[in-house]
Structure formats: C-alpha cells, structure tokens
Amino acid sequence: MKLKTYILLAAAMLPLASCSDYLDKTPSKSSNTPVTTAANLLAVYDYLPNRYCNNYFAAYSTDDANIPREMYLSSPANFDINYVLSYYTHFRDGIINTSSDLLWNNEYNRIYKANLMISSSSEVTGTQEEINEALSCAYFMRAYSFFELATFYCQPWSETNKGELGVPLRLGLSFDEDVSRGTLEQTYAQIFSDLQASEEHAIHDAVPSIPWRVSKCAINALYARIYLARGEFDQALSYANKALQKAPELYDYNQFTWQSPAPKYSATDFWPAMELKVCETNNWNENKILYNYSEWIYPDFASVRTQMAYPSTSLINLYDHDNDLRFRYFYVEHGTRRMSNIKYDWYRYNPWDDGRYLNSGLTTAEVLLIKAECQVRLGQWQEGLATLTPLRKARFEAATSTALTANNQAEALQQVLEERHRELPFYFRFGDIKRFAVTSDTSDDVTVTRDFYDMTVTKVNTGSQKTYTIPGSSKCWAMPIYQTEITSSKGAIEQNPE
C-alpha cells in the first residue's frame, strides 16, 4: 500500500470538473499540495477514483458468472489465469500468486485517505460546517471500506464466527502501524464506531446535490446493509425504514432508450455482420452515471477491467425476457461479439459504460429489498411482498408489472430473494451467498459449481476436465490475500485458512 500524506492534484485527478462549482475551491494543480483547508479535505474525498474499486471477485466468483469450456477454448488469451480464471474457479494458489490485488489495495487507499482527512481535521481552516462534512464523509468512507473488506476477505458474521480473523484496522498514517488482523468482532466494532462518528458530524439529512457526499440517509442505508449481512433483521428493518424516509424516488427504467447509433461489427469467419442493441448507459461515463441515475443514496461501483461479465444460464432464467427492463437493457444478446476474438455466442452483462462497472453502491432499490426481506423473515411476509410492488413497477415495461404473490412465508422468501437477485446480480451475490450459509433457514443456501479444467498458476490443462464445487458454507468464501501483502507485512497479516 504505497500511499502519500499529500493530495496529489495533477490535472487528471480533478473529479468531474464540469459538474459543480465546488471544484473552484480545489487546491492548485501542482503536485504535493498540503492539506491546510477544509476544502482540501473534501478534495481528498471527492477524487473520482474514490467512487470505485476493482473487483474480480464480484465479476467471476459467484453463480452469476459463466465461462463455459467452449467459450474459453475459442479464445484462451481473453481469460487471464490469475485475474479471471482463478477467481472463477476459486483456485486458491492462482489468487494468492497474483501480482496485485486491486480490491485490497484500492480499499486501503480509501482508508488511508479517510485517515488523512480525520487526522488533519483539527489543523485546517474553514467553517465548522465544512469540517463536519469532511469528517462525516471520512468516517463513512472508512466504515464502507472496512465492511467491503470484511465481506470479501472474512467469514460471514455469526456468533460462531465472531472470533474468526477480521481485517487490519489501519486508523492512522504511520507505516509502522500494527496490521495484524484481529477478530471479526473487532472489525465490526470499528465499522459501527465509524458510522456513529459519521452520523455525529453529518450535515445532510437527504442525499445532497453532490450525490457522493454523505447524508444521514446514506448512513442509515449502510447500517441496514450491514445488519442484513449480520442476520439481525429487526435492526436492518429499522434502519431501512429510516433510510427510506429520505431516499430518492426509484428510477423508472422506462426512461431508458437504446444507444443510437448502435455499435456495428463487421462479419468474421465466425460472426455475421451485426449491430448490437445496447442501452444508452453503455455510453455513460462516470460523470453521467453519478448524475443521471437519480436513485443513488451513495454511489459506488465495482470496476471490471476486463469488461467481461458473462451471465450464467440460471441468472438469465430469473428474468421475464419480454417485460423486465433490467434484462432487456442490461443483458446484451450476442454480447460476446464485443470481444472480437471470442467465437462463442452468449450474453454480456453491461449496465454501465461498456461493461466497465457493476453497481455496488447504495440505492433506493437495495433498501426496499432489505426491508422486504426482513419483513418476510420476521413473519410479515404479505407486507414484504407488497413492499416490492413499486420497485417492480419501476423496472418493468409500463403496464406489465405484477405484484409478487405467495401462499406462505417460505414461498414469499423465495420470491423476495429472487427479486433481490434480479435487481442486484454479481457484486451483491457474493455477500448474499456467504450470509445465506449462516442463516437458520437452509432453503436459501447456495452451492457454486464450475465445469472447467484443471489448472496450475501458469497453465490451464485443457486435457483434464474438472468440476469445482464450492458450497456457500466453505471457508474459501473468505478469499485469500495475495502473497505480496502477506510478505510485505513480515507475517503480521495472517493468511485465510483453506
């Protein structure tokens, strides 16, 4: 984690320059600008890359991902062993031996920036409101990142697991700081402490005009997400209700249109000449995603550098192909044509910017889904189904949506979880698989199966087919930490057990 104690404000780092005049307060473009004002603190936070982290786990490690043998064989060079196939098959040695883990590094970069803001807050000039906003954002960002790290690198929360390994709780700026992992209970205690501090300094009740600035609505929504992950459904429901009081309106997907002109591709020895029908969001950059998609409570993305999120048949089959606009616009038929070397016809999941991003941020839809699931699990199953009626109306072609129905609580839970899966695939599925494994209801358990090939860290052995079976209860869902980080810590960071 090579980090600096100064804001590096080269021209390329200036975030969203056309969006708001708040950038007039940003320090000069020279490098090594010290943090001396509250505006400097907010500039650290507003830096655009703070809004996303690279995440191959989200793209490839769940049952939402699909890389059939035939797809791989059509173009092996498209599927990197370390950054695609190892994550796809949960191949431990391959993940450990990656040259860098971008999710781990990006999250600790965000944590470092939060620590810089917190440690500098008593020494800067500016109004108390500006300082409070900076502190609220910093504590929130740190809590968000610690929870993200816990989701991917720790065992799921339960009374049994609370003594398992947590994540390094870096709270200062010193490189000599203790980086031992502590326990999962200690990690969550820090997350809750940071959220409490964020709320104490919050100056916005609802989502502000700069949507990534923190509000009490966002704090409540993150509490709801965390308590859902912990299986504390009464608490999650309470915070979801608080968040919904100030949440933005649902984004009506009937507002979306097709990109025009459509991307055109010439004929090849495998593909005919074609135009791909893609949603207008295929052409949305980060700026448009942040501002045009008005449902954000707190925007955040999982970046997929490969731009290859290929959905499984089971995921595709969850949708109404005729009327569900999530399927119509985001699952691109013949989408593998986008990668010219792949000679295998399949869908490509592409919600944003030519498949560069998956949603990982807080939205009104997610909070409604949290509320509905908690209602059902707490016995209020008719109310839980009704909670999702507005969401389905906003996601289906006009006048075609229907209310979810069930005959009992078990059926209602299945309906709500399937709706959650349709709305929040890939990124959210990872955490869901883990938490389902520790609920008292075994009906939600998931096992991921891969029919692929035997692998080493340098080679895919196409002469040796192999089936990988990863139950949700497997300890391997606490993903291994890459070896460079273990080595650089001189053993202070303990590796996850097999």
What are these model-derived regions, one by one?
Residues 19-67, 316-322, 399-400, 442-498:
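Membrane-proximal, proline-rich intrinsically disordered regions
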Residues 48-56, 230-231, 237-364, 411-447, ...:
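Extended ligand-binding clefts on enzyme/binding-domain cores
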Residues 80-153, 182, 195, 199-207, ...:
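Conserved, well-structured interaction surfaces
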Residues 111-114, 188, 195, 240, ...:
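Inward-facing hydrophobic residues that define packing positions of alpha-helical scaffold repeats
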